[in-house]
Amino acid sequence: MNKIFTTLTFIILTISVAGQSRDIHVFAHRGCWSKTEAGEFIIPENSVAAVAEAARRGYEGIECDVHLTKDGKMVILHDRTLNRTARKAGDYSKLQEPVYLKDLTFEELRRDYVLESEDPKLRTPIPTLEEILTECRRQGIIPMLHSAVWASYEVAQEMMGDDWICFTKGVEKMQKVRQFSDCTILLAINDGTAEENIARLKSIGGNCGISTMKYRLYTADFCKALTDAGYEVQASIFPFAEEKLAIGNGITYLLTDRILPSGKWKKIKTR
């Protein structure tokens, strides 16, 4: 997320839809993280600091990834290994050999590793799910859980009420989530016609929609069919040119790696 929208670029992006006015919900992918030109994290991804920065810049919410330690503790990390995002806690040295999360107990994880950051104050332990949700609640923004860990849904519902987003694949799993939550559900897809995806969403019920990284799926006709039927359409970390095209084609959610200029931009307004 080291690419920053200038105000001008952001305005060009937001007015690309002609003839209508609508809101697009903007979420920060793994929080609002950033890197130096040399590639070292400034604000670490999937960190409490990245949640706070997303709130400061006005995102409606953040997306985060939930995985389990060896002893079953839910923590926020995208990769199977710690190597890309963490360093040794003792001397801040890089991890030379692969360090797999599944091989570490929660105590080992918190004791031996910190998130990479050029700012020593942000070299914090990899956060738990509860720590991220607590910060979202404190900052007043919505967590989007990209998770296959069932217990994470239950914790989110307990801590956030219905003010969270369940984002994963599997219609049957989402049907079970709907039994205890009225949260927004975004079903991860890779294929299917608009009609096929509408049928999937009907079987889930409530406020729900689809999300994909396959930007070629999101033609104007495809997006219109979904939104006319009352469903959400999320563009998930598209390349910049395809993000602009998707906004023009009618998406309702934007999950992005690009940094918005500071300010209360809870939603992109198109017209």
Regions found by a protein language model. Name each.
Residues N2-F10:
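Sec-dependent signal peptide recognition
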Residues F10-A18:
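Hydrophobic h-region of N-terminal signal peptides that target proteins for export
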Residues G19-R271:
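Phosphate-group recognition and catalysis centered on beta-loop-alpha active-site segments
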